[in-house]
Amino acid sequence: MAELLTLARPYAKAAFAYASEQGATDNWSNALQVLSAAVQDEAFSAYLNRPEHTPAEQVKLFAKVLGEDQSQAVSNFLTLLADNDRLVLLPEIAAEYEQLKSQNNNNVDVVIESAFPLTAEQEQLLKSALEKRFNSTVTVSVEVKPELIAGVVIRAGDQVIDDSALNKLEKMRTRLLA
C-alpha cells in the first residue's frame, strides 16, 4: 500500500498543480473519483487490462467512462499513466489528490477510532483541540473499534496519535519481553 502511494504521489501532485493553475480542481476531483471507481470495478479492470489493449485503447475506454467530463488535459494525463503502466494507481492518485485539495483549502480530514461511541460533546471537544493543533479546519469522522479496549486513535494524513489501551498494553508487553 505504501509503495503504491509512493508511486502515486508525484502524479497526484502534478495533476493538482495543473488543475490549480487552470482553476479546475473540482472538475479534476470529479474525474479522478469516477476513474478511480472504474479501475476498482472488477469487470472493467479485467477488460481494461487485457493484453491486446494498447495504452491508446485504454485511454479511449476511459473516455467512454468519463463522457463529456473528459478534457484534453485529463486525456493527456491518462495517456501518461497508460504509457507508464500506472492506471492501477488511479485510486491512490485520487486519494492523494483529495488530500492535497484539502490541504490547499486549509482543511484536514481526521479519522478518530474509538473503543466506544463518542458523544457529540466529546467529538466537539476533540475537534476543537485538533483544529488548534493543526491550525486549520478539521473534518472529523468517527469509527468505533472495540478491539482498542479503551481510548482513541487519531489519524490525520500520515500522522497518528495512538492513545488506546491496546497500544499501551502492546508497549508494556514489548518492555516485559525485552
UniProtKB/Swiss-Prot annotation:
A Pfam family hit: OSCP
Sections of the chain in a coiled coil: none
UniProt KW keywords: ATP synthesis, Cell inner membrane, Cell membrane, CF(1), Hydrogen ion transport, Ion transport, Membrane, Transport
Gene3D superfamilies: N-terminal domain of the delta subunit of the F1F0-ATP synthase
Gene Ontology cellular-component terms listed: plasma membrane; proton-transporting ATP synthase complex
Membrane topology term: Peripheral membrane protein
Compartments reported by the entry: Cell inner membrane
Keyword Acetylation set for record: no
Family stated for the protein in its record: Belongs to the ATPase delta chain family.
Function: F(1)F(0) ATP synthase produces ATP from ADP in the presence of a proton or sodium gradient. F-type ATPases consist of two structural domains, F(1) containing the extramembraneous catalytic core and F(0) containing the membrane proton channel, linked together by a central stalk and a peripheral stalk. During catalysis, ATP synthesis in the catalytic domain of F(1) is coupled via a rotary mechanism of the central stalk subunits to proton translocation.
Subunit structure: F-type ATPases have 2 components, F(1) - the catalytic core - and F(0) - the membrane proton channel. F(1) has five subunits: alpha(3), beta(3), gamma(1), delta(1), epsilon(1). F(0) has three main subunits: a(1), b(2) and c(10-14). The alpha and beta chains form an alternating ring which encloses part of the gamma chain. F(1) is attached to F(0) by a central stalk formed by the gamma and epsilon chains, while a peripheral stalk is formed by the delta and b chains.
Name listed for the protein in its UniProt record: ATP synthase subunit delta
Taxonomic source organism: Acinetobacter baumannii (strain SDF)
